């Protein structure tokens, strides 16, 4: 299976580029595709909060813009926390879960989030998207 350490580190590294002047809560995501490509994303806040975009969706949209489609995604890692602090548990929001369900097999797609970093080692939670979004909306 995927190299979770590499994916978690990419999410944590991406978090540094978050644009979060209003909340101060930075989120980074790293989305792994079947060909081994990792697409990163960050949350991008806006003074009009409705225009804000989450890190997970930023990563998905970058991958889709690059031609990736349903079946091309293996896992996503998320790192969130204070802009200048250590990560705290940050599961994906409902909108991000729904967007992920559009492009993945929820039963096999892995969702990871960093829970803490101790002495350089990242602890994380691991779930399938189906566990996090039972009964996803589908057409």
What spans do the regions from the language model cover?
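Short beta-strand scaffold segments in enzyme catalytic cores
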Residues: 24-32
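Short Gly/Pro-enriched turn/cap motifs at secondary-structure boundaries
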Residues: 19-22
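Short acidic-glycine loop/turn motifs at beta-strand connectors
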Residues: 33-35, 117
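Short, solvent-exposed cationic patches
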Residues: 55-78
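Compact, glycine-rich, soluble single-domain proteins
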Residues: 43-57
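C-terminal binding/interaction regions
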Residues: 2-17, 71-139
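Small-residue (primarily alanine) positions within well-ordered alpha-helices
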Residues: 11, 29-30, 59, 63
């Amino acid at each position: 299976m995927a190299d979770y350490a590499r994916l978690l580190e990419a999410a944590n590294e991406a978090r540094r580029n978050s644009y979060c002047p209003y909340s101060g809560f930075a989120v980074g995501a790293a989305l792994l595709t079947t060909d081994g490509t990792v697409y990163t994303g960050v949350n991008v806040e806006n003074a009009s909060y409705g225009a804000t975009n989450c890190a997970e969706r930023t990563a998905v949209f970058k991958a889709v813009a690059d031609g990736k489609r349903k079946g091309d995604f293996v896992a996503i890692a998320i790192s969130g926390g204070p802009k200048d602090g250590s990560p705290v548990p940050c599961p994906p929001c409902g909108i991000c879960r729904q967007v992920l369900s559009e492009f993945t097999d929820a039963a096999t797609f892995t969702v990871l989030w960093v829970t803490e970093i101790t002495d350089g080692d990242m602890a994380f939670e691991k779930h399938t998207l189906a566990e996090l979004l039972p009964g996803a909306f589908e057409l």
